[in-house]
């Protein structure tokens, strides 16, 4: 089995995340994309939508995708979880022949600061989803995504056109309340 892990806060999930998953399924030689919402990103101090709410939104959004799995491993831990922990858990669970780890190009400048980065880089092949304004070194596999949407901006100004229709109204109500 070959899998790609796509971790993130998904606070909120948006059409850019869907575009990344679709491109990964089209361009990578994989059986599944496993989406792993964080409980709390180790580089952040808080979240706005609760982990369980973000998990529920992701399950609704990706229900029609038979090659996408939503993994609640980090949410169940109830604490910030390092990528290396999640990778080791998923390696034990699936024993994949190939393991990709999808990151946004905005994560590249701090990737070397990730916990046990050297070990992690030997266990996975990083795939970088491009975003405007970030250069991607040739050593990384790349997925081009043209939807330049920011979860940070959507928390401040939720806009329906950037949100998955199945959860758009719920997300807008949540962030406007």
Swiss-Prot record:
Keywords assigned by UniProt, alphabetized: ATP-binding, NAD, Nucleotide-binding, Nucleotidyltransferase, Pyridine nucleotide biosynthesis, Transferase
Function: Catalyzes the reversible adenylation of nicotinate mononucleotide (NaMN) to nicotinic acid adenine dinucleotide (NaAD).
Catalytic activity field: nicotinate beta-D-ribonucleotide + ATP + H(+) = deamido-NAD(+) + diphosphate
Annotated family: Belongs to the NadD family.
Keyword Transmembrane helix: no
Name this protein carries in UniProt: Probable nicotinate-nucleotide adenylyltransferase
One GO term (biological process): NAD biosynthetic process
EC primary class: transferase
Disulfide bonds: none
Keyword field contains Transmembrane: no
Taxonomic superkingdom: Bacteria
Pfam families hit by this protein: CTP_transf_like
Enzyme Commission number(s) of this protein: 2.7.7.18
GO molecular function: ATP binding; nicotinate-nucleotide adenylyltransferase activity
Pathway: Cofactor biosynthesis; NAD(+) biosynthesis; deamido-NAD(+) from nicotinate D-ribonucleotide: step 1/1
